[in-house]
Amino acid sequence: MATKLIKHGSEAREEMLKGVDILANAVKVTLGPKGRNVLIEQSFGAPKITKDGVTVAKSIELKEKIRNAGAQLLKSAATKAAEVAGDGTTTATVLARALAREGNKLVAAGYNPMDLKRGMDLAVNTVVEEIKKSSKKINSQEEIAQVGTISSNGDKEIGEKIAKAMEEVGKEGVITVEEAKNFSFDVEVVKGMMFDRGYLSPYFVTNSEKMVAELENPFILLFEKKLSNLQPMLPILEAVVQSQRPLLIIAEDVEGEALATLVVNRLRGGLKVAAVKAPGFGDRRKAMMEDIAILTKGELITEDLGMKLENVSIKSLGTAKRVTISKENTVIVDGSGDKKSIEDRVLQIKSQIAETTSDYDKEKLQERLAKLSGGVAVLKVGGATEVEVKERKDRVEDALAATRAAVEEGVVAGGGVTLLHTSQILTKLKVENKDQQAGIEIVIEALKDPLKQIVENAGENGGVVVGKLLEHKDKNFGFNAQDMQYVDMIQAGIIDPAKVVRTALQDAASVASLIITTETLIVDEPSKEEPMPMRGSGMGGMGGMDF
């Protein structure tokens, strides 16, 4: 077992905060419409250029163990914000650093860290409630485009394409992003279906950066029962291997020996495979599997019809242009089912909706109808070089996630203005415990930092702009860093999803609280590199090489 390095008190926190600063300084330059790019060296291929805060954060690992612990904690705030709201990662990073720095100063001055945390939590909850109250629902295509534009760092085309995609498939519809093979940026609507079941093992993942399994032109096996033994499937598996195409297995469950065997074959590269549970329960599960069978021109292997796995041929398998599987969802794009069969199935479901008297059944049937007939919108992102395409695709994915968040919880004034103005509500929040009151003061000051950083990235003095905005009572009055003018942010279309702002603050406060309440830190002690043995010849420095 490796020996451990143990640090206590302010010494541990100060060293962690050095790591926090290193990561925050790399991420903060991307904030706002005039934020800068960050170039990241990759282990292979061209360097990556990005303005995405979480991509920058994820790329950072520090050599010093204690500093790295601080950096990794800060990284978790950005990552959580990206997972929950899809955006706000840089804001979360800037807020977390400000909260942790100020909190640590007070702990060093003798304040109780647990009471500071309670005060911070009280302040954060008050701000979150205010954000929810002041959020405005968005309905028009223009408003959706505005959110997409701001989240993609002012790229109007991205905002407009996302709005168009949402118009095509509905706000709740499935929208995916992929790289185009030309210069253009287009929206294409294809036949497709998404259901809420993810991969049964993370070993099926093919894209480790996004933690998704991507299968191009796969066969799709639909089996009504549980799969616990692959012996009956061997003939069909051999046929799939010979075809050199991937396989998606959708069954009631895949467990035990069957799952282990699939994972081993996937890791050895013999069979490109992924397995997911079938969506729904009971009779509804069977109906949804039949929908998938029609969509992919496959057959549902069910013992009710006397079908057995050992007798299944490759003709019984469905096919699709592409399948993407995340931890929680599976998206089947462009199944090869014929139009007439799909239309007949849609009419059948519509007649069932008309006949049913149960609201619950009606809702579930309408969900099936939307999945079968709604289609999938694909945003095809092009560019002049591979580096440009990847950078733009990252921004499109961020903007899409932010737009979904805006549809879900509404929008507030953007550009850090909402956080700044809600900080003034906290000045009226008083508690008897002086340490908790100090925790509230920490949050008041930290809420000014995102706007300061946006302004400073645009080349102006952040403190001066913050002071000028706080003189105004209008909560929507802010600074447009793109045009360098003071405007009504809502009227100017500078809006942020309420969910993004809320999540950024909550995740930042969570991480900062962990840092200021840490009293002991235990990490692996760095190994001391042994000196290389000297050789008799003049090439002594080569002694450590082993061929």
From Swiss-Prot:
<comment type="subunit">
    <text>Forms a cylinder of 14 subunits composed of two heptameric rings stacked back-to-back. Interacts with the co-chaperonin GroES.</text>
</comment>
<dbReference type="GO" id="GO:0042026">
    <property type="term" value="P:protein refolding"/>
</dbReference>
<keyword id="KW-0547">Nucleotide-binding</keyword>
<feature type="binding site">
    <location>
        <begin position="30"/>
        <end position="33"/>
    </location>
    <ligand>
        <name>ATP</name>
    </ligand>
</feature>
<protein>
    <recommendedName>
        <fullName>Chaperonin GroEL</fullName>
        <ecNumber>5.6.1.7</ecNumber>
    </recommendedName>
</protein>
<dbReference type="GO" id="GO:0140662">
    <property type="term" value="F:ATP-dependent protein folding chaperone"/>
</dbReference>
<dbReference type="GO" id="GO:0051082">
    <property type="term" value="F:unfolded protein binding"/>
</dbReference>
<dbReference type="GO" id="GO:0005737">
    <property type="term" value="C:cytoplasm"/>
</dbReference>
<dbReference type="InterPro" id="IPR001844">
    <property type="entry name" value="Cpn60/GroEL"/>
</dbReference>
<feature type="region of interest" description="Disordered">
    <location>
        <begin position="528"/>
        <end position="547"/>
    </location>
</feature>
<keyword id="KW-0963">Cytoplasm</keyword>
<feature type="compositionally biased region" description="Gly residues">
    <location>
        <begin position="537"/>
        <end position="547"/>
    </location>
</feature>
<dbReference type="InterPro" id="IPR027413">
    <property type="entry name" value="GROEL-like_equatorial_sf"/>
</dbReference>
<comment type="similarity">
    <text>Belongs to the chaperonin (HSP60) family.</text>
</comment>
<feature type="binding site">
    <location>
        <position position="415"/>
    </location>
    <ligand>
        <name>ATP</name>
    </ligand>
</feature>
<keyword id="KW-0143">Chaperone</keyword>
<dbReference type="InterPro" id="IPR027410">
    <property type="entry name" value="TCP-1-like_intermed_sf"/>
</dbReference>
<feature type="binding site">
    <location>
        <position position="496"/>
    </location>
    <ligand>
        <name>ATP</name>
    </ligand>
</feature>
<dbReference type="GO" id="GO:0005524">
    <property type="term" value="F:ATP binding"/>
</dbReference>
<keyword id="KW-0413">Isomerase</keyword>
<dbReference type="GO" id="GO:0016853">
    <property type="term" value="F:isomerase activity"/>
</dbReference>
<feature type="binding site">
    <location>
        <position position="51"/>
    </location>
    <ligand>
        <name>ATP</name>
    </ligand>
</feature>
<comment type="function">
    <text>Together with its co-chaperonin GroES, plays an essential role in assisting protein folding. The GroEL-GroES system forms a nano-cage that allows encapsulation of the non-native substrate proteins and provides a physical environment optimized to promote and accelerate protein folding.</text>
</comment>
<dbReference type="Pfam" id="PF00118">
    <property type="entry name" value="Cpn60_TCP1"/>
</dbReference>
<dbReference type="InterPro" id="IPR027409">
    <property type="entry name" value="GroEL-like_apical_dom_sf"/>
</dbReference>
<dbReference type="InterPro" id="IPR002423">
    <property type="entry name" value="Cpn60/GroEL/TCP-1"/>
</dbReference>
<dbReference type="InterPro" id="IPR018370">
    <property type="entry name" value="Chaperonin_Cpn60_CS"/>
</dbReference>
<keyword id="KW-0067">ATP-binding</keyword>
<feature type="binding site">
    <location>
        <begin position="87"/>
        <end position="91"/>
    </location>
    <ligand>
        <name>ATP</name>
    </ligand>
</feature>
